[in-house]
């Protein structure tokens, strides 16, 4: 199995509960195929670097994955089909850090709730 980090952006009008459902669906896909989610981080509602369609903001979410390339491809296929996800990027990494990402470290914890940061 390989390690991947996947960041996806959800439309700004989607609620946090709906984002949780999206993440739960992705978690189910990975766990059903003997993979694991090593890290989850919600980075909050942030301005996009440029307008994507009619969207100027989006909810950013990071997933650290320990899975096979085939499962990663299935996860990306699901992201493409989900109309609430406006962009995503998945990269292969050597390892996944136990510490919060630099973006999460720089955020004010008062303004943005952290949904989950886990490490195995």
From Swiss-Prot:
**What are the annotated GO cellular component locations?**
cytoplasm; ribonucleoprotein complex; ribosome
Does rRNA-binding count among this protein's keywords? yes
Tagged with keyword Cell inner membrane:
no
Q: Name one GO biological process term.
A: translation
A Pfam family (short name) is Ribosomal_S6
Organism field: Rickettsia bellii (strain OSU 85-389)
Would you tell me the protein name for this molecule?
Small ribosomal subunit protein bS6
State the similarity comment: Belongs to the bacterial ribosomal protein bS6 family.
Return the annotated region ranges for Disordered: 97-120
User: Which InterPro entries does the entry mention?
Assistant: Ribosomal_bS6, Ribosomal_bS6_sf, Ribosomal_S6_plastid/chlpt, Transl_elong_EF1B/ribsomal_bS6
Polar residues composition bias: residue spans: 97-112
- Entries under SUPFAM superfamilies matching the protein: Ribosomal protein S6 (SSF54995)
Superkingdom per UniProt = Bacteria
Which NCBIfam families does this chain map to? S6 (TIGR00166)
Biological function: Binds together with bS18 to 16S ribosomal RNA.
């Amino acid at each position: 199995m390989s390690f991947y980090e996947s960041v996806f952006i959800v439309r700004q009008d989607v609620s946090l509960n709906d984002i949780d459902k999206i993440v739960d669906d992705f978690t189910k896909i990975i766990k059903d195929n003997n993979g694991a989610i090593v890290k989850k981080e919600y980075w909050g509602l942030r301005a996009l670097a440029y307008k994507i369609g009619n969207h100027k903001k989006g909810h950013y979410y990071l997933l650290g994955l320990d899975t096979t390339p085939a499962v990663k491809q299935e996860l990306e296929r699901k992201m493409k089909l989900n109309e609430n996800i406006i962009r995503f990027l998945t990269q292969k990494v050597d390892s996944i850090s136990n510490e919060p990402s630099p973006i999460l470290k720089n955020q004010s914890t008062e303004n943005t709730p952290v949904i989950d940061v886990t490490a195995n």
